[in-house]
Amino acid sequence: MLFCIFAKSSHTPANCPARQQKHTFMIIKRILSTAFAIAATVVSLAGVPPVSHPKIGTTAQSDDGAITITLVAKKQNYGGSADTRDADINSPKSINIHPDGSKYYVNSLEGCTTISYDFKTNRKLAVIHHQFREGRDDALWSQPSGLYPWRHYHNNVNTFAGKPVESTFSHNGRYLWVPYYRRSFDINAQDPSAVAVIDTRSDKVVRLMETGPLPKMVSTSPDGKTVAISHWGNNTVGLIDISSGKPEEWHHKMVLTVDRQLDLNYPLNRSVDRDNGSGYALRGTVFTPDNRYLIVGCMGGGGGIAVIDIQQQKYLGRVLGMMSNVRHLVISNGYLYLSINGGGVVQRMPLKDFMAVARTMDGTTRKTATARNWENCNVGKGARTISISPDGRYIFAACNNVSQVYVVDTKTMKAVCHIGVDSYPVGLDISSDGRYVFVTSQGRSNHGGNAVNIYEVTYKNPPSARFCPACGAPRTDEMKKCPECGLQYEGMTVMNGNITPDKTPDGTQDAKNTAIKPIYYAGGALAAVLAGVFFFVRSRRRK
């Protein structure tokens, strides 16, 4: 390329200094433009780690042999064989195993679908399309609450396709709540979105309710009376009363603001980056076991964890002191666990210690407090969803940047093994017996993704112990309440870190340190080009 650029200069008349100087300048400009274009392209690729596609049968084991994890099945929308290929897996964002272990649900963000599968056979049971039309689907909608005003769009707002993000079960697993990242026409997610409620008996949408802009995380309270939805888009959290068993009687309770609500006024004809720069970027959301508080991770802004007093219907403030970029929250065995996306870390603190700090805030005169003495465990960069074995012994973390699932021993807070997963993992869930872990790989920048990996987990000592989710005291089936803290057990169980009402019964590529290499190559290429410019100019001056 450079040879061709230099060659074009040979026809410049030698007896015209002005033209020669101008021509030299144009050549240098062309060289520099080309160099920077090459460098920019290479650097942009540096943000996309290498793609990984582990083969079925891939296995990892802890050094002491206490836990072994094996990739046993896949659902993938690329290559593969007839029994693994699935065209409905389109940017799978999250996965949720039904509390009774009969089926599991995958949210395909870009496919605008939720797919249900038989847990034992992996047979597809239904494809639930999130596409709605005003007039035809009016009966699905709850009454407008007045809490979510429309500011930019006003016509046919109930005709859209919804992009499903996360999910939570309610009413003993009868219903699955699925918020939409945005309505398809709202290109910058600045007006109300919606949440769909799927009846898991029929696998059909039976209710639609409005939400704030860009909802991501959704959680059900331990007593099964409230659903909380955190709005990434504008620093707010919505609460829905679901105390009735009838969907038509569910209604919005209130919207609470974390410090300040963002004023959204983006173009209607040009997309902007809403994944970044969205205030606190509210993400991980979980109720405390006593139903009293809702805690919400702040992935952006000033970071921390927002605390809402459900009883007083009041935002208290943000607890600080943990690492920045909090992504997912789980409460298990008396501990609050966090995944730290950027740092690739799992942190924890006794829940009682965290709440002692949180209760020092009042939402007015004191809106921040610092919690210290966190325990840390390094896992892979890009730690996204975390889930915990039923006995609380092991944490499983989907690590996006390195395309790995990490396993952490909670006794030592050390990573004991990790295993490859299709790039780039985001969602994760574990079966109620701890024997299977399901991971969704969404992909990034049109690389990797479009896969669900299914792992079988074997333990030297299978999970059996159960603990109080509030204080960590041992728990048995006969206990109706915790003898230590008095938490009522009746009507609740702990599954995957979310406390929900009881339900009756192709080769792996190492991604380590490889993402930085294109930057070195880009720098080297740019240096070489600049050196070429220097010697070219020097030779022209000699002439």
Model-derived segments and their meaning:
Residues 47-465, 491-492, 496:
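Predominantly soluble domains enriched in secretory-pathway, periplasmic, or organellar proteins
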Residues 35-44:
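Bacterial N-terminal signal peptides
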